[in-house]
UniProtKB/Swiss-Prot annotation:
UniProt xrefs under Pfam families: YciZ
Superkingdom of source: Bacteria
HAMAP family cross-referenced by the UniProt entry: UPF0509
Annotated source species: Klebsiella pneumoniae subsp. pneumoniae (strain ATCC 700721 / MGH 78578)
Protein name: UPF0509 protein KPN78578_12530
Protein family according to the UniProt entry: Belongs to the UPF0509 family.
C-alpha cells in the first residue's frame, strides 16, 4: 500500500489555492492535473501490487 503523506498533500493543495487567489487559473488547473496524475499513479501501483498472484506459502 502506498504511503501518502497527508502533510505534503495539504501543502500542495495550499499552493494551488495560493495560485488561485493570485488569479492564475491556468497554472492552478495544471498543478491540480499533475497532482491528480500522481495520485492515480499511486493508486494504480497499489492495485497492481494487490493483484499479484500469491506464492503457494502465502495462500
Amino acid at each position: 500500500m502506498s504511503d501518502v503523506n497527508a502533510h505534503l498533500l495539504a501543502q500542495r493543495i495550499d499552493t494551488v489555492l495560493d495560485i488561485l487567489v493570485a488569479g492564475d487559473y491556468h497554472s492552478a488547473i495544471h498543478n491540480l492535473e499533475i497532482l491528480k496524475a500522481e495520485l492515480l499513479a499511486l493508486a494504480a501501483d497499489d492495485a497492481e501490487q494487490q493483484n499479484q498472484p500469491k506464492a503457494p506459502w502465502e495462500i
